[in-house]
Structures are given as C-alpha cells and as structure tokens.
Design a protein with these regions (language model features):
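Enriched for short, Lys/Arg-rich terminal
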Residues: 1-5, 14, 21, 27, ...
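A short, compositionally biased N-terminal segment around positions ~18-40 that is enriched
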Residues: 19-37
Length: 84
C-alpha cells in the first residue's frame, strides 16, 4: 500500500505542544497516520459537515483527524488540550 499524505490544519498547530515529550508523541502519532491511515481514534465525532472524524488522545492532547481514502490523504483538523 502506498503511504498517504498527511495534512495538518495550520490553526491546529497553534494549540499543539511546541517542544518536549508531548510534541514528540503528538508528531509521532501524526506521522504514523501516513502508514496506518485506517487507524481509529479513542472516540468518534461528527464534524460541521456531518463527516465521521476520529479523536485520538495522545498524552494530554486530543488529535482530530479523518482519512480521505480516494485521494490517499489524512487530514488532521484539530490538536487541542484533552479534557481531564
């Protein structure tokens, strides 16, 4: 299987961790989506257009993403501090 391209919304990067172990863990998960685009999150939500999106908790951050399989892309739409 060909690796997918992973795109991160620039607004998501604003709230992403800037350094340290948290950033490393978040970035490793995002990179893993290229070779495992069928990855599912810890829970499922619907976005503003009704599309199913997955939310994965990585450390203290919630990463929202969805796979666009016809074009071999994964879109990361949000990276936010996870609720406690």
């Amino acid at each position: 299987m060909r690796p997918y391209q992973v795109y991160v919304n620039q607004e998501a990067l604003v709230s992403a961790p800037r350094s340290g172990p948290s950033r490393k863990a978040v970035m490793e998960f995002i990179h893993s989506l290229a070779t495992d685009p069928h990855s599912i999150g810890d829970f499922v939500e619907r976005d503003e257009v009704g599309r199913t999106v997955y939310v994965k908790i990585v450390g203290r951050f919630a990463i929202t993403f969805w796979a666009d399989h016809p074009v071999l892309e994964v879109k990361v739409t949000h990276i936010k501090p996870a609720d406690k």
